[in-house]
Amino acid sequence: MSNGKLILLRHGQSQWNSTNQFTGWVDVDLTEKGEAEAKRGGELIKEKGLHPEVLYTSLLRRAIRTADIALNAADRLWIPVIRDWRLNERHYGALQGLNKADTKEKYGNEKFMAWRRSYDTRPPELEDGAEYSQSDDPRYANLDSVPKTECLKDVVARFVPYFKEEILPRAQKGQTVLIAAHGNSLRALVKHLDNISDDDIAGLNIPTGIPLVYEIAEDGSVVNPGGTYLDPEAAAAGAAAVANQGSK
């Protein structure tokens, strides 16, 4: 049996990516650039001869629309789709909606980077009923409680068990699975796949719209540690741009 494949695709540029705002669970849409990135991601998938058989994505439109655009470009729009909140972006708490550069200037680089990139430091909580709260959002009505803030450790705790139970078995059977998600939900997954330490994960940045492919053996092990970007040059530039967020 041939190896299975996981295609990790971070959503294309969102409206708040373009304005350098913390987004989290706020349901902003793609920009025109983001739509173009999603289309190019799908074209790369097709050009490399990859054939996704199922899609997993979040409940946020920037990931859902990225997946639709990419699958259309790859001629795979017909495949089954599973949407689950556990693939959502990290909840940024009271930082949601704030400009990153202004936040860094106000609180200092050390606190800014701890909130943004440390493994287990949560930003301040977002109060229920606040402007960017999801406490009354109908898509989360079945949750016992909606997060008020999260660190990356929290994202690992909600996403990785779901991945092991629902997604990994498909890859172990040789399937090709597309996972269209977010910077931090994908960082959580890559941390697990590559066994990255809690300290080192701070240095990992996922670029928008560029597919990252992992080959998975029948026993669930990763055949190509670190994964393979379908456009390495663009991925390096994109990751550097993500790392530089917070600058004016």
From Swiss-Prot:
Question: Site annotation (Transition state stabilizer): which residues?
Answer: H182
**Documented EC number(s):** 5.4.2.11
Provide the reaction this enzyme catalyses. Answer: (2R)-2-phosphoglycerate = (2R)-3-phosphoglycerate
- Record InterPro entries: His_Pase_superF_clade-1, His_PPase_superfam, PG/BPGM_mutase_AS, Phosphogly_mut1
Q: What class of enzyme is it?
A: isomerase
Q: Name one GO molecular function term.
A: phosphoglycerate mutase activity
* GO terms (BP aspect): gluconeogenesis; glycolytic process
Q: Name one Pfam family in it.
A: His_Phos_1
- Domain of life assignment: Bacteria
| Residues the record marks as active site | H11 (tele-phosphohistidine intermediate), E89 (proton donor/acceptor)
Q: Where does substrate bind?
A: 10-17, 23-24, 62, 89-92, 100, 116-117, 183-184
> Which controlled-vocabulary keywords does the entry list?
Gluconeogenesis, Glycolysis, Isomerase
Q: Which NCBIfam families match?
A: pgm_1, PRK14115.1, PRK14120.1
Q: Do you know which HAMAP family this protein is assigned to?
A: PGAM_GpmA
The task this protein performs is described as: Catalyzes the interconversion of 2-phosphoglycerate and 3-phosphoglycerate.
| Name under which the protein is recorded | 2,3-bisphosphoglycerate-dependent phosphoglycerate mutase
User: From which organism does this entry originate?
Assistant: Corynebacterium kroppenstedtii (strain DSM 44385 / JCM 11950 / CIP 105744 / CCUG 35717)
Gene of this entry: gpmA
